[in-house]
Amino acid sequence: MQKFECTLCGYIYDPALVGPDTPDQDGAFEDVSENWVCPLCGAGKEDFEVYED
């Protein structure tokens, strides 16, 4: 699965990691609620871009 990066603060959403920062168990970013926000800065889902390692 792809990782996504917050363009405002640099937080990396990694669907392989399940924990308090991930909104659901399967982790696919496309399936995350539109109401979800970055756990570090509160940016909306629209402020994330595909992260290239």
UniProtKB/Swiss-Prot annotation:
Q: Which PROSITE patterns match?
A: RUBREDOXIN (PS00202), RUBREDOXIN_LIKE (PS50903)
Q: Which UniProt keywords apply?
A: Electron transport, Iron, Metal-binding, Transport
- PANTHER family listed in its UniProt record: RUBREDOXIN, RUBREDOXIN-1-RELATED
Against SUPFAM superfamilies, the record matches this protein to: Rubredoxin-like
Q: What does this protein do?
A: Rubredoxin is a small nonheme, iron protein lacking acid-labile sulfide. Its single Fe, chelated to 4 Cys, functions as an electron acceptor and may also stabilize the conformation of the molecule.
Question: The Rubredoxin-like domain covers which part of the protein?
Answer: 1-53
Gene Ontology terms, MF aspect: electron transfer activity; iron ion binding
Report the sequence similarity comment from the record: Belongs to the rubredoxin family.
Signal peptide annotation: none
Locate the transmembrane regions by residue number: none
Q: How is the cofactor bound?
A: Binds 1 Fe(3+) ion per subunit.
Pfam families, sorted: Rubredoxin
Kindly list the cofactors needed: Fe(3+)
Protein name per UniProt:
Rubredoxin
Q: Name one GO biological process term.
A: alkane catabolic process
Tell me if ATP-binding is a UniProt keyword of this record: no
Query: What is the source species?
Result: Peptoniphilus asaccharolyticus (Peptostreptococcus asaccharolyticus)
* Binding, Fe cation: 6, 9, 38, 41
